[in-house]
Amino acid sequence: MKLTVHGCRGSIPISTPQTVMYGGNTSCYELIFGDYQLIFDTGTGFRNVKLDNLKKTIIFYSHWHHDHIQRLAFNSGIFNSKKNIYISSALNDKKESKSIIHSYFSGFYFPIELTKKLSNLKFIEFDDLKKDFEKDFKIEFLNLNHPGGSVGYSVKNRKNKITILLDNGYDKEQFFDLHKFAGKS
């Protein structure tokens, strides 16, 4: 498994000499292994992700705040009609996920209606996706403490485990659940 952090900032992207070491982009993490390219959130770092036409690309959203979805439409790879991109969130069902993306990237807020223009964006239920790919990897989620809700993800294949816990207002009562969830990562 190879994890690339394309963005780790919260709220707004920033570009200053102080952010050179870790970057100034908002949330976007790319995990590559086997036939898969998993992307966690599409903050401003998503514009730097090279979508791999030879891998199954799945975008998982931790939650729907602006800094976690704002660059979905700014990665030219999503406009390749031959490249299916699966979108899922353990936070809600596929209908609500599509509705949120549709609202965010449509007329009133954005110049194109992304979900209508791009038929290659495939919204899928988290549980269905989990079943479809269980022979290759196991993905779990954990509810986190964040306004509006948020989830963390744990991905495990035959060799490795990576846990991605993004926005969370830590409460000491979470310690054992977080420890168990992230164990052996």
For the regions a language model picked out, list residue spans one by one.
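Binuclear metal-dependent hydrolase catalytic cores
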Residues: 1-163, 170-176, 180-183
